[in-house]
Amino acid sequence: MELENDTRIPEFLLLGFSEEPKLQPFLFGLFLSMYLVTILGNLLLILAVSSDSHLHTPMYFFLANLSFVDICFTCTTIPKMLVNIQTQRKVITYESCIIQMYFFELFAGIDNFLLTVMAYDRYMAICYPLHYMVIMNPQLCSLLLLVSWIMSALHSLLQTLMVLRLSFCTHFQIPHFFCELNQMIQLACSDTFLNNMMLYFAAILLGVAPLVGVLYSYFKIVSSIRGISSAHSKYKAFSTCASHLSVVSLFYCTSLGVYLSSAAPQSTHTSSVASVMYTVVTPMLNPFIYSLRNKDIKGALNVFFRGKP
């Protein structure tokens, strides 16, 4: 029993992006700026939706929740990385690493489910406009949100418990800027067959399945839009989906890039850089993508800050 306990290490080293001292101030300033923009942008979007009663609709309900999750998602990794860069201390305890991994998987999963639910919401709004508010009632919206949280929490808990059974013998260095699940599994010196099988199963169930749902929803949406005779109505229908489609494409393309880069040999640096895209860049861009051409969001913020439409 004592031998087994000795294989449990007290801490890991997060190697980050670069050990070059001259690059540390640049990296700190870059990620601090992106972090602050992410928090501010998503908070403003939540503020706009909550302050304007006209935006209390299913679409904006899910959008506000997506912004909240994006804030939490970013807060699981960036603050620790900023502290490590500033203090030049890359140590993270075993317990902190497990906690960070759990919440990262939790919020990444909720992000994924919410994007799928939002695609379903747009499908209902465009394909069944007369019954939209009846179908997408507050009870169903709350239920879809609750199911997203529960499924993601269960998945995150299961993956975390699977990591807790692993032993780490000699390799204490994580070639990443946070405790990423796949990196943790690769560092283990015990048998990881079950962990890898669970990882692939989760990728199919929680990655491919929601993506198929999104693609199916947009296939039906495009088919429905093509049947609209009015050019103005076509443009309006398409514009309501363009923002969400941009966010979905950004999220899934960058996630796929991380998955492919982590599967390739000798690609830890590439995987870290690719991870920045969906852990930092995507949450930062989401509020701007949704509000750039959205007159309702800009109008709500204008009323809130200036007191007039």
Swiss-Prot record:
Q: Which residues are exposed on the Extracellular face of the membrane? A: 1-25, 80-100, 159-196, 261-272
UniProt keyword Metal-binding present: no
Residues modified by carbohydrate are N5
Mark the transmembrane ranges.
26-49, 58-79, 101-120, 140-158, 197-219, 237-260, 273-292
Where does the record place it? Cell membrane
Enumerate the SUPFAM superfamilies for this protein: Family A G protein-coupled receptor-like
Chain ranges on the Cytoplasmic side, renumbered to this chain: 50-57, 121-139, 220-236, 293-309
Per the record, membrane topology reads: Multi-pass membrane protein
The alphabetized list of GO BP terms reads: signal transduction
Where is it chiefly localized?
membrane
Instruction: Look up the record and report any one GO term of the cellular component aspect.
Output: plasma membrane
What GO MF terms are annotated?
G protein-coupled receptor activity; olfactory receptor activity
Q: Which PROSITE patterns does this chain map to?
A: G_PROTEIN_RECEP_F1_1, G_PROTEIN_RECEP_F1_2
Superkingdom of the source? Eukaryota
Report keywords, A-Z. Cell membrane, G-protein coupled receptor, Glycoprotein, Membrane, Olfaction, Receptor, Sensory transduction, Transducer, Transmembrane, Transmembrane helix
The record's InterPro entries line, in alphabetical order, gives: GPCR_Rhodpsn, GPCR_Rhodpsn_7TM, Olfact_rcpt
Which Gene3D superfamilies does UniProt cross-reference here? Rhodopsin 7-helix transmembrane proteins
Indicate the family of this protein. Answer: Belongs to the G-protein coupled receptor 1 family.
Q: What does this protein do?
A: Putative odorant or sperm cell receptor.
- The name this protein carries in UniProt is Olfactory receptor-like protein OLF4
